[in-house]
Amino acid sequence: MGIDVNIRITGGAGQGVHTAGGLISRMAVAAGHHFHATQDYMSRIRGGRNSYSVRVMDSPVRAGRAGADILLALDPAHLPHFLPSVDPPGLVLSDLPADAPAGRVTSAPLSRLAVSAGSPILGNMVGTGIVARALGIPLDTVDRLLALEFRDDFLEKNRQAVRLGAGWAEGRVPGAFRLPPAEFRPRLILSGNEALALGAIAGGCKFAAGYPMTPGSSILLGLSADGPPLGLVFEQAEDEIAALNMAIGASYAGARAMVATSGGGFALMAEALSLAGMMETPVVIALAMRPGPATGMPTRTGQEDLSFALSAGHGEFPRLVLAPGSVEEAYSLAFHAMEMAEAHQVPCILLTDQHLADTVVDADPEGLEVRPVRRRIARGAEVPRDGEGRYLRYAVTPDGVSPMAVPGEPGVTVVADSDEHGEDGHLTEDPGVRIRMVEKRARKEKGLAAEALPPLLSGPPDGEVALVGFGSTKGVIAEAREILAREGVPAAAVHLRQVGPFPSGAMDGILARYGTVLTVENNRTGQLARLIRAETGREVSGTVSRFDGLPFTPGELAREIRERL
């Protein structure tokens, strides 16, 4: 068995939980290993009970796990909640009162050493120094990583705090969790939302707008930070309605455009989504799901908006709905969304969720492919005109996709309307024209379906059990499948990257080969199971649901599947 160490840092908002977790993650990469970090945080600015878990392995990590090997509790009041998750013989560190009884917890003087380092807020760095010693990470490595984060006097204080923590740990902390030396390989440290933003930029996004809404806000941060040097214009709008209308306007003018939001913001965008459908204007909407309804649980995870994304907006119009299942897929599918939205002149929805949004991994730079962007703007002789020389923005074509010119093309007036319209873009109430235009738009479904991303199948190509999921359940299903295989229960994992148009034929062919089919979903009603039934006519055997706001973990999922079989 290879390396598998799970470090969990806990504390209130403002105690530096995220900073410590991020530094420990980079320490693992610097030592030549891989990590998968997940965050669990409350919807408050200060206080609360937050955690940052870093799972370190000697091979790429696909999911977090429930049990911790090292627990660093920056607030000892959190120990009763987190202690049960520590696997024996785990190391538990916290700043206990002097009169606290001895037990499973190693009392570490985090506060005293933080003050000695120059600031009482440096307890997280003292604890990081202790963890570095437990993992066998050289202090010069930690110093180098700190220099990437801090400057001047505060850098020296952080370095001193780490040294004091590591010095205290000498002789007090067991070496059971030391990471063996491994060859360093350059890696990119990315969250799901950071990868999604980079994929959109690589896909040619030149305009982005949004109104902050957790867990989609960090997509906007990534776009606004990394996009402008590459020609992207970013606008923080007054609300989600304005954001999507701005993006549609930018797309009409020829810029690839996107927005990012969560469920409540997407609800406000529904009318503009229909506008994009009627105008046949390409636009990408990143929908970062969280538990609802209404405000729901802003900082928790869920997959409750699958059906909403597939049917939002009034009227009937084609759309593409993609669901990345990993940080790497967040990048590649964001690129794909930009390309497909313009190729088919449809809105494209990228479904992610808080779990994937905030998951951080070390990604292989070569796996994040940068390809040439293929623009599909009609120019010159490509612009269709009627007998009077007018541009036919909505020219009827066999595949439903009309040559798209943009304002500024010489001799061309680009007419677009939210009313039903004819080929020239001017509104109409002619029943015959209405039928032709509805059928024209609908023909895009065939093109989208022909280019549908097929389900990804791993494990036995046929047999007794298939586990089906979409989006962020990909990694946890894959690891749960491996746990079941070791226990003598062979199962296949089926991951859907595209849910609309649904890859019905491919999915039906796969599911026909298995006796028991279970969907794994972070919602109560089995929305994926309903979608499979509607699109293939197949009734799945059951649904493993979790809707408490927390993600599945591999061991828990494998246990529940065993109970179902």
Which residues fall in each region the model found?
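Active-site cofactor/cluster-binding pocket
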Residues: M1-G203, F207
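Thiamine diphosphate
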Residues: G2-A66, I70-L83, F207, T214-S311, ...
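Peripheral docking tails and interdomain loops at the edges
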Residues: A13, L110-L122, G127-F150, G313-H314, ...
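Short gly/pro/ser/thr-enriched loop/turn and capping motifs at secondary-structure boundaries
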Residues: M42-I45, D99-P101, L113, S217, ...
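A short helix->loop->beta-strand "cap" motif at the edges of active sites that frequently abuts
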Residues: V86-V92, G103, L232, T281, ...
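Gly-rich Lys/Arg/Thr-decorated short loops/hinges at beta-loop-alpha junctions or inter-strand turns
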Residues: G171-R185, A200-C205, L223-L230, A286-A288, ...
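Flexible, low-complexity linker and terminal segments
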Residues: L190-N193, L333, M338-L565
